[in-house]
Amino acid sequence: ICIIPWIFLAIGILTKGPVAFIIIFTTLFSFLLTHKNWKKLLVKINLSKGLLITFLISSPWYFIQLIQNGNVFWDNFFGYHNLKRYTSVVNNHAESWWFYLFILILASLPFSIFLIHGIVDTFKELINKSEIRSESSNSIYIFSLCWLISVLLFFSFSATKLPSYWIPAI
């Protein structure tokens, strides 16, 4: 098992909380849907060992915080900084649903046209050619597209929108 991705997931969970977990597993799920041999790929990922590694690295800090601060930590970190920011507008940071599409174009300047071209090409190949679903040479493009769309969709549904929320897509 390659433990490096699981270590980075744990670091993401330590720095950003459950959002890191949600983004990774939304990406992973959508990526698996694009592959004919998704079961074989799932075995290679070794989900149970990976999740155990992630849990062992990230959980001690959360447990210590809960023991030291109790409900204050729970309400502040999970309640306010995760749930409330996602479900309601905080600090007047309301934007329309397409806000991150604009950020996508703006953040990728001056290469926006290449990004859009790559997205469109990958979508076309994914839809039109069934053989792409088993080719490993295209996997990085498909995974990147799944990652980009997962971040874009997740944060587009968020009530509070900040340009910095887009950073995980980069």
Region locations from a protein language model:
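Membrane-interface transmembrane helices that cradle and orient dolichyl/undecaprenyl
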Residues: 1
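Substrate-binding/catalytic cleft of secreted carbohydrate-active enzymes
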Residues: 4
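Transmembrane-lumen/periplasm boundary regions of multi-pass, lipid-linked membrane glycan transferases
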Residues: 7-8, 15, 20-166
